[in-house]
UniProtKB/Swiss-Prot annotation:
Coiled coil: none annotated. Belongs to the phosphoglycerate mutase family. BPG-dependent PGAM subfamily. It comes from Prosthecochloris aestuarii (strain DSM 271 / SK 413). PROSITE patterns: PG_MUTASE. GO terms for molecular function: phosphoglycerate mutase activity. The keyword Secreted does not apply. GO terms for biological process: gluconeogenesis; glycolytic process. It catalyses: (2R)-2-phosphoglycerate = (2R)-3-phosphoglycerate. Keywords: Gluconeogenesis, Glycolysis, Isomerase. It comes from the Bacteria. NCBIfam families: pgm_1 (TIGR01258), PRK14115.1 (NF010713), PRK14120.1 (NF010718). This is 2,3-bisphosphoglycerate-dependent phosphoglycerate mutase. The record marks H182 as: Transition state stabilizer.
Amino acid sequence: MIKLVLLRHGESQWNRENRFTGWRDIDLSEKGLAEAANAGVLMKEEGLTFDIAYTSVLKRAIRTLWNALDTMDLLWVPVEKTWRLNERHYGSLQGLNKTETAQLHGEEQVLVWRRSYDTPPPPLEKTDERYPGNDPRYASLSSEEIPVAECLKDTVARFLPYWHETIAPQIKAGKKVLIVAHGNSLRALVKYLDNISEEDIVGINIPTGIPLVYELDDDLKPIRHYYLGDQEAAAKAAAAVANQAKG
């Protein structure tokens, strides 16, 4: 049986402050560092090991991966970083407090921006200092590849080619894979793996720092999936993600 492990980064400083983060490179909070280490403990207790790991080019995911692997004594595992695993780009909302944004625009509108499949938030101007085209880590990307705002549909479109061309072949070759990424890049993969509809993906929330194990058949079709550790705590953490924009 194939096991694929997905892990959303630990709590970031902006998660703690309830701000839209997107492609802004915000580090982990103290709680997030502890979550990352605890994720490593949970995976080690489960008897998991890895041959290769994938993560984004954002430090909150990279540091989560480091801390988890360090706890497992697996820092030697090869790591591939890709912008295709970045969080979805939240456009001009990046840096804004979610509750204050909901008070300004209404909870329903913010829910659409946060969780709908095909409605992006207001775009970022390319003259804005937050525009990723100004960041050297994206120097190899074309202007068409660099987003000014993304909906989940856009995130799926940029991630799935990497899944099919890079990650899936490694899994089929027998490699044990860990993916440490972000709420929406992982939702994009979960939507694909579980064949979740555009309507139902709105209700899927992934908590920080809790490993999600997928058991797959030889065609990489899911047999089942489950969070490691306390299931009730995982459910409460996922519900808390859903409530972030509420007052």
